[in-house]
């Protein structure tokens, strides 16, 4: 999971653990932006990125990746690092969703759009969904991209959204949260619907205590996602062998 909305937190995790996914060049871009953010100069940023690669990138060859590293550094220098933090949701917003008397799937998609709207507003951007429908479908917990189309059409009929010619979605609804009570804090933006499902009791999820990813609970003592649990077990095994 590459957290594109909380890049400062993500970069700090990289410095502690190395690469977190197989999208290494994308992650290096986040790391380079972070180094610029904390005040390093261009030459220092390049040195730090290469040091990181030498430590965490098996068989890394600076000459082989020269062009890619240069491109990453140039891109990072001109783009501001993104840190949304947590998105709080109030009881007024939940009540708005449920007042429409639509299906549970509809409610989950609307909740996801609500969070995305709040993210865009926090970044000073217009309230649009402009990612691929396949990615948005995953945020909504839908098994197929095809399932999103009838829901979006229904939302457009209700005046909640406007589907643009380029398939971007303008989010039109507004909820008055005055005197609203904070009931949810969304941190994992790759699995937004999990928070709504948790709140409504449809499913039970936890945030992995290592990476923050929302994962379905399969036992009362579960604290980590599968990947982090595997990594923790490997570390424990190594520590036991040292004794």
Q: What residue ranges belong to the model's regions?
A:
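Modules that initiate DNA replication and primer synthesis
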Residues: 1-104, 125-127, 133-196, 229-230
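Detector for short helical micro-motifs
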Residues: 107-120
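Residues immediately within or flanking Cys/His clusters that coordinate Zn2+
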Residues: 203-205, 222
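Short Cys/His-rich metal-coordination motifs, predominantly Zn2+-binding knuckles/fingers
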Residues: 208-212, 228
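Cysteine-rich micro-motifs
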Residues: 219-232
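Short metal-binding segments enriched for Cys and/or His
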Residues: 229-243
């Amino acid at each position: 999971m590459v957290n594109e909305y909380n890049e400062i937190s993500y970069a700090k995790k990289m410095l502690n653990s190395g690469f977190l996914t197989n999208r290494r060049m994308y992650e290096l871009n986040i790391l380079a932006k972070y180094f610029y953010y904390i005040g390093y100069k261009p030459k220092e940023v390049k040195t730090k990125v290469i040091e990181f690669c030498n430590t965490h990138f098996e068989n890394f060859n600076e000459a082989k990746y020269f062009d890619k590293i240069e491109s990453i550094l140039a891109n990072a220098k001109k783009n501001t690092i993104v840190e949304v933090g947590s998105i709080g949701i109030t009881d007024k917003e939940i009540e708005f969703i449920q007042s429409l008397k639509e299906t549970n799937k509809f409610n989950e998609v609307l909740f996801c759009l609500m969070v995305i709207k709040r993210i865009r507003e926090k970044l000073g951007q217009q309230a649009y969904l402009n990612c691929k429908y396949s990615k948005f479908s995953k945020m909504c917990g839908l098994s197929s991209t095809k399932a999103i189309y009838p829901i979006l059409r229904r939302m457009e009929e209700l005046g909640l959204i406007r589907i643009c010619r380029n398939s971007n979605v303008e989010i039109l609804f507004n909820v008055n949260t005055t005197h609203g009570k904070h009931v949810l804090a969304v941190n994992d933006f790759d699995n937004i619907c999990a928070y709504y499902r948790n709140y409504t009791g449809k499913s039970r999820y936890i945030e992995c205590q290592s990476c923050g990813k929302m994962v379905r609970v399969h036992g009362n003592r579960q604290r980590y996602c599968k990947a982090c649990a595997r990594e923790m077990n490997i570390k424990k095994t190594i520590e036991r062998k040292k004794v």
